[in-house]
Amino acid sequence: MSMSSYPRQRPRRLRSTVAMRRLVAQTSLEPRHLVLPMFVADGIDEPRPITSMPGVVQHTRDSLRRAAAAAVAAGVGGLMLFGVPRDQDKDGVGSAGIDPDGILNVALRDLAKDLGEATVLMADTCLDEFTDHGHCGVLDDRGRVDNDATVARYVELAVAQAESGAHVVGPSGMMDGQVAAIRDGLDAAGYIDVVILAYAAKFASAFYGPFREAVSSSLSGDRRTYQQEPGNAAEALREIELDLDEGADIVMVKPAMGYLDVVAAAADVSPVPVAAYQVSGEYAMIRAAAANNWIDERAAVLESLTGIRRAGADIVLTYWAVDAAGWLT
């Protein structure tokens, strides 16, 4: 019997039908993998659209409660809350973030009351939204971010957020020693079960641009003395390993799409879950292309999220969390 000249190995066999492709899929994307970032602003009477992020708003307390309930009903895995205070409440040390009556802590209590343990309630643990200079920390007399003074404020922020009902605190300022200090502070205050999601590898990225509008940032200058250089993968792994040593329960890479190599490397070394943040600029980029009918928004979003999961992210923060949950179910 003569051998066929055609290939015996035909990978297309495993792509022949929808059912076959589903059976052999190597990467899953489910609503539970997704976390919805949400913004809540003080002093507004109705949701305020964020022009650079079409479809995303700064919520009032009431609209936040409705949107959060809808996200939970859609099956989204968690909610990450950012507070936007009034300009007159900002100061040099971010006091509004620690104030129990500050917008973020009040909103956390609202959602903790409404949702209980039906979702994972996360809080951004940083000062940039609350400072009049827009930096992620306390400035010294030369105008530089004072690492240790900032970490002390982060501990106060984290404890205030835990007291308000956060299940997860997310230190995002990239200060040295922040995870260990926050862990010690939470434990001393009795919040031993509150999870720390460490922004372990946060790069100084151009893709944060729309976020500055989202939180009404007062920043002038840049954050390159504490956020990482985009080309430094080995440094990112060092930061991840330091945060793991300090007790991080989850480590995150931010942004996501331009840093999938770092996500993959983090997944290789991390014994705890790895998260990745599909940031505002990534969202705006796809939305703009879709608005011009240059790409199919749904297909592009699901492909991008699948790529982040394929790289090794267990959790993906995305402004499409609710939309994607609907598309996936």
From Swiss-Prot:
It is an enzyme of class 4 (lyase). GO terms for cellular component: cytosol; peptidoglycan-based cell wall. The gene is hemB. The keyword Magnesium applies. Catalyzes an early step in the biosynthesis of tetrapyrroles. Binds two molecules of 5-aminolevulinate per subunit, each at a distinct site, and catalyzes their condensation to form porphobilinogen. This is Delta-aminolevulinic acid dehydratase. 5-aminolevulinate 1 binds at R212, R223. 5-aminolevulinate 2 binds at S280, Y319. Pathway: Porphyrin-containing compound metabolism; protoporphyrin-IX biosynthesis; coproporphyrinogen-III from 5-aminolevulinate: step 1/4. It comes from the Bacteria. It catalyses: 2 5-aminolevulinate = porphobilinogen + 2 H2O + H(+). The keyword RNA-binding does not apply. PANTHER family: DELTA-AMINOLEVULINIC ACID DEHYDRATASE. GO terms for biological process: heme biosynthetic process; protoporphyrinogen IX biosynthetic process.
